[in-house]
Amino acid sequence: MMRRRRLLLSALAVLAVSACGQPDTDMSNGKFATPKDAALYQAAARGDLAQARQLLAEGASLNSRNVRAMTPLDVAMVEGNRRAFESLLELGTDPTWLGDARDTSMHFAAKLPDSYWLKALLKRGFSTEVKNRLGETPLFPALGTSTQANVQLLLDAGANVHVRSKDGRTLLHQAAMIGSFDDIPRLLDLGVDPRAVNEAGHTFQRYFFMGPRNPETEKKVRAWLSVHGIAVEDQM
């Protein structure tokens, strides 16, 4: 899980360096799949929808993915380019499209610290329940210390907290596995099943008690489990 975060940060750093690049530079650093896609992004960044539509008619794609499996919409979010972002949505980009990638743009937005992107997508009515290749909804990548605003946005939009991934993980499992321990008391209060086991046969407690954690959070979790008659599994 931490490796995924490191890969995302690496992609953010590479794209930030090239944020002002022209189409040829964008191609050389792998930011876009084809020259037409690079030109499409540049047109969107200028707000030139007529030129962008012409490029789409000539074969450019809103759904192309670069060497990091990022769509033009993902690139816009990473670069902080709101004009490109809004233009691409106006042109018909679907942030719930998965294709052959691991994540949709909804998942990508959910893991970014700047909540502007996810808020904008939710405001446009895109689903909170779209699943990635692992069967995760955007709530899974939204968990974490730097993305609490995204968790709240998804909850406010009615996201299902009882969802499970293909390998049986609940949001409690996810929070414990990535070390986002402060999310756990809230998820318990929201009704996520603490008895649920994943494909490996473990409840979230297996991952919560196996590593370093905040003493105050641990105290809250132990108290919650005790009040609800659930045995503490701290002897692994």
PLM features: what roles do these ranges have?
Residues 4-9:
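N-terminal export leaders
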Residues 18-19:
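C-terminal motif of bacterial Sec signal peptides marking the signal peptidase cleavage site
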Residues 42-47, 75-81, 108-114, 141-147, ...:
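Ankyrin repeat A-helix N-terminal signature
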Residues 48-56, 81-90, 114-123, 147-155, ...:
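Ankyrin repeat structural motif
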Residues 194-233:
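Leucine-rich solenoid repeat scaffolds
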